[in-house]
Amino acid sequence: MEIHMTSIQELVINFHMTEACNYRCGYCYATWQDNSSDTELHHASENIHSLLLKLADYFFADNSLRQTLKYQSVRINFAGGEPVMLGSRFIDAILFAKQLGFATSIITNGHLLSTVMLKKIAVHLDMLGISFDTGDYLIAQSIGRVDRKKSWLSPARVLDVVTQYRALNPKGKVKINTVVNAYNWRENLTQTITQLKPDKWKLLRVLPVYSKEMTVLQWQYESYVHKHQVHADVIVVEDNDDMWQSYLMINPEGRFYQNAGACKGLTYSPPVLEVGVEEALKYINFNAEAFSKRYQSIHLPLAMSAGA
């Protein structure tokens, strides 16, 4: 089936607020060359506010990307590292983005998402995204999804977080991200996903940005997808080819960045705060058609779908 670019409802910008994380996932590519914690924008709330204002001014107005994709709204997806580690600075960023008119979402490992934190952000959060790869503690250890005390996010804890979020924000959406890798591809999460009832379950094939460590073969990835066909109505499949140049991403220093290719690392723009959004976008390769394809594919049959 041939997919043509068409209009999308929502443009998503992924803002990785920090490289800091309480986990050490072996496949993680949320690391940036020459990034220093001292230069991450979150240290000064005015820098975060300035970045979000520049994004609002550009993406809410008429621009070439809007003419191409014809999007109606813009969502800021706050990611990391682990954004929840930033505490009040993370909360402030969500509230300010919402105040400007952005839809908001986060992707978190959920480990630090306390009841207190949820009560502060849930009503301002349109989508809660949780990165959850395994329901097996030993597999979690192998992947690096444990903290320094060897604690992890168990299926029971994920269910507790999701239940609390839905109670606080009944209109909010829940997304689960699972990275299919060399350690978890044999696992079956059907029972856990049945309990969580996510609005979307994204199955990402581990991406070899820096190395091929923990990658899986095509048949291994497809095996994982097909064993979970019972959840085909919410599954979004995202193979490696679907990910290249199909995301709008900003690093903790406020630079747009893009995957350069398999094991080739990343390319960067100058800081948005210095050159503005329009100029910064010229420095990265963003494939609007690939982005559009990911969002069109959500409702395609599972065997033909790509990620979103």
UniProtKB/Swiss-Prot annotation:
It is an enzyme of class 4 (lyase). PROSITE patterns: RADICAL_SAM (PS51918). One of its GO terms (molecular function) is lyase activity. GO terms for biological process: defense response to virus. It catalyses: CTP + AH2 + S-adenosyl-L-methionine = 3'-deoxy-3',4'-didehydro-CTP + 5'-deoxyadenosine + L-methionine + A + H2O + H(+); GTP + AH2 + S-adenosyl-L-methionine = 3'-deoxy-3',4'-didehydro-GTP + 5'-deoxyadenosine + L-methionine + A + H2O + H(+); UTP + AH2 + S-adenosyl-L-methionine = 3'-deoxy-3',4'-didehydro-UTP + 5'-deoxyadenosine + L-methionine + A + H2O + H(+). Gene3D superfamilies: Aldolase class I (3.20.20.70). Its EC number is 4.2.-.-. [4Fe-4S] cluster binds at C21, C25, C28. Pfam families: Radical_SAM. Its cofactor is [4Fe-4S] cluster. Residues 7-253 form the Radical SAM core domain. The keyword Transport does not apply. Keywords: 4Fe-4S, Antiviral defense, Iron, Iron-sulfur, Lyase, Metal-binding, S-adenosyl-L-methionine. Coiled coil: none annotated. PANTHER family: RADICAL S-ADENOSYL METHIONINE DOMAIN-CONTAINING PROTEIN 2 (PTHR21339), S-ADENOSYLMETHIONINE-DEPENDENT NUCLEOTIDE DEHYDRATASE RSAD2 (PTHR21339:SF0). How this protein allows bacteria to resist viruses that do not encode their own RNA polymerase (such as lambda, P1) is unknown. Belongs to the radical SAM superfamily. Viperin family. Expression of pVip58 in E.coli (strain MG1655) confers resistance to phages lambda, P1 and T7; delays culture collapse upon infection with T7. Catalyzes the conversion of cytidine triphosphate (CTP) to 3'-deoxy-3',4'-didehydro-CTP (ddhCTP), guanosine triphosphate (GTP) to 3'-deoxy-3',4'-didehydro-GTP (ddhGTP) and uridine triphosphate (UTP) to 3'-deoxy-3',4'-didehydro-UTP (ddhUTP), probably via a SAM-dependent radical mechanism. NCBIfam families: viperin_w_prok. This is S-adenosylmethionine-dependent nucleotide dehydratase. It comes from Pseudoalteromonas ulvae.
